[in-house]
């Protein structure tokens, strides 16, 4: 969002203005703490899209509302919006929250450690699995939900199971954000 606006403005010789930053860090301190002090949770998600969508579609005054917003693209971020601030959200890029069309999402820690030390993958390959070659594409060879839905209509049970799992994981993340808003 922000980089694209800057590029277009530069080409046109004008200034660019955006309403929200592409990434923002408004997370509650308690939301950052994990079971390993050297691995805090980070605020990396689709902030610009989430805030704009909330303002446009909630039908309420955003700054006076508590909302849960799910951005569902190649990466999926689910944010708890409390009175205009996103106080908790999964890191949609680095392996937190639901898996997505091309991102791995949360992975059981001990299983990931086994894979890391298996000698079968390089560091770069594993980072790609987390951020661009994981999720639905790792199971089905495509990141297109439309193609997966077509496969399901043709009777592909594996495609149905993977898409059901994606939806299930998004639903769980929405539930987690409901708990974050309840305090």
PLM regions with names:
Residues 1-22:
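Conserved phosphate-binding loops in N-terminal lobes of ATP-dependent enzymes
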Residues 2, 75-79, 173:
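Short glycine/serine/threonine-rich phosphate/pyrophosphate-binding segments
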Residues 20-25, 133:
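Short glycine-enriched loops at secondary-structure junctions
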Residues 26-29, 139-140:
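Short acidic/His/Gly/Ser-rich catalytic and metal-binding motifs that mark active-site loops
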Residues 31-118:
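Glycine-rich phosphate-binding loop of actin/hexokinase-like ATP-binding domains
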Residues 94-99, 109-110, 123, 130-138, ...:
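Active-site C-terminal subdomain of aminotransferase-like
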Residues 128-182:
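Adenine-nucleotide phosphate-binding core of ATP-dependent small-molecule kinases
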């Amino acid at each position: 969002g922000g980089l694209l606006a800057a590029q277009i403005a530069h080409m046109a010789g004008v200034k660019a203005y955006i309403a929200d930053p592409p990434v923002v860090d408004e997370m509650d301190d308690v939301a950052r703490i994990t079971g390993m002090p050297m691995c805090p949770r980070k605020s990396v998600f689709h902030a610009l899209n989430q805030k704009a969508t909330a303002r446009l579609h909630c039908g309420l005054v955003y700054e006076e509302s508590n909302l849960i917003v799910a951005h569902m693209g190649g990466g999926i971020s689910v944010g708890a919006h409390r009175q205009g601030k996103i106080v908790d959200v999964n890191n949609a890029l680095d392996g937190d929250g639901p898996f997505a069309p091309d991102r791995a999402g949360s992975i059981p820690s001990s299983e990931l450690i086994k894979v890391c030390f298996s000698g079968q993958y390089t560091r770069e390959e594993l980072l790609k699995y987390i951020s661009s070659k994981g999720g639905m594409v790792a199971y089905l060879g495509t990141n297109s939900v439309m193609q997966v839905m077509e496969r399901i209509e043709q009777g592909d049970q594996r495609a149905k199971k993977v898409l059901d799992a994606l939806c299930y994981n998004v639903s769980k993340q929405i539930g987690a954000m409901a708990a974050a808003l309840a305090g």
